[in-house]
């Protein structure tokens, strides 16, 4: 059984209530911390590192499983204050951005060399980083400038979206939801709006002899967001009912 601290953890939802409760709990258990970039310190966390063998160096709620999983994945830890936290793979891109370095060769370096390079670069910058600590690991290292990044709690986004659907498209039905450490998504169908929204599409398909396909089509929306910098908060209109949902037009997006 997967543990929430594992980088590969993911879960699905069959009801909006379950998805909302999951993200409310996630928000309560998450920490957003501001630290000077030059106060951050990176250490290697693979099986050969000294930190791997000293679990007492980690923050009180960091489990042995979280340390072991990190040693198998990114292999780095961050010292925040006096405690160390494993770094999740989702934080790698934003950590490089705070150090202002990039390159395909970096992942190929030993964890000791990579940590040393990161520390040398991080020490130069006095601006702030906005750190997300979630499920026992540093999950993101965003810019601390509010112009660059704003926290948009997923549970609040879901509530706002549900209110909008109830107001504008009454009768909308939650279809499915998904969440992992990088991304959260959900989809709804709008059976009450089918006749109004799909009249033109159905007429075209029926004229082409695709009556069965026309009868299966259902308008819907797909919601996607991320706390780790993978995506903005966006809602896309969809045609559902076929094997693969079809995007209609563009999307409404709000950057974090």
For the regions a protein language model found, what residue spans apply to each?
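Feature for intrinsically disordered/low-complexity regulatory segments and propeptides
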Residues: 1-160, 169
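Intrinsic disorder/low-complexity polar-acidic segments
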Residues: 142, 149-256
């Amino acid at each position: 059984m997967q543990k929430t601290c594992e980088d590969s953890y993911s879960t699905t939802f069959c009801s909006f209530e379950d998805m909302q409760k999951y993200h409310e709990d996630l928000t309560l258990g998450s920490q957003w911390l501001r630290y000077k970039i030059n106060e951050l310190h990176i250490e290697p966390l693979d099986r050969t590192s000294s930190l791997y063998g000293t679990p007492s160096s980690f923050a009180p709620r960091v489990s042995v499983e979280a340390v072991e999983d990190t040693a198998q994945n990114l292999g780095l830890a961050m010292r925040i204050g006096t405690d160390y936290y494993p770094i999740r793979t989702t934080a790698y891109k934003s950590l490089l951005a705070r150090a202002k370095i990039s390159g395909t060769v970096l992942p190929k370096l030993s964890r000791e060399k990579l940590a040393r390079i990161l520390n040398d670069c991080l020490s130069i910058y006095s601006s702030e980083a906005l750190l997300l600590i979630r499920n026992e690991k540093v999950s993101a290292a965003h810019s601390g400038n509010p112009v660059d990044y704003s926290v948009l709690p997923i549970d609040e986004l879901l509530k706002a979206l549900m209110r909008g659907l109830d107001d504008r498209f009454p009768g909308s039905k939650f279809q499915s939801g998904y969440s992992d450490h990088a991304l959260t998504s959900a989809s709804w169908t709008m059976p009450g709006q089918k006749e109004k929204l799909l009249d033109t599409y159905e007429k075209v398909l029926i004229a082409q002899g695709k009556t069965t396909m026309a009868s299966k089509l259902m308008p819907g929306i797909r919601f996607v967001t991320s706390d780790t910098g993978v995506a903005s908060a966006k809602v896309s209109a969809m045609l559902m009912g076929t094997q693969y949902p079809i995007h209609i037009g563009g999307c409404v997006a709000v950057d974090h």
